Amino acid sequence: MSKYMILIHEREADYATMTPEGWQSVVDAHSAFTKAVADLGGTIVGGEALQQTTTATSIRSGEVTDGPFVESKEALAGFYIVEARDLDHALEIGKLTPAPFGGVEVRPVLDAPAAGGR
């Protein structure tokens, strides 16, 4: 099994006005996702939701600035690291990832021993 990162990009503004019931539906969707990954034969290795971009600090060329690097309607909201058989399997898992206000990006995690032979 190989590792893949599922990056969840969503519109923060939609979460700012969400009701408690809306939040519960998001939590329920992620719980169902966890079960679905196992049912597909994958494994969630880790993952977290991220705080709003207003809490981000960026460093570029040694210069520290508040906020993310670029202005965008969608921001990185969270991520999962999953183990999947191959990219097709990871994409199948990625399609199930809850992102009601955006979408996801699936990327292979670089295998450190293989890094020298990129």
PLM region descriptions:
Residues 1-118:
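Conserved, structured core segments of small domains
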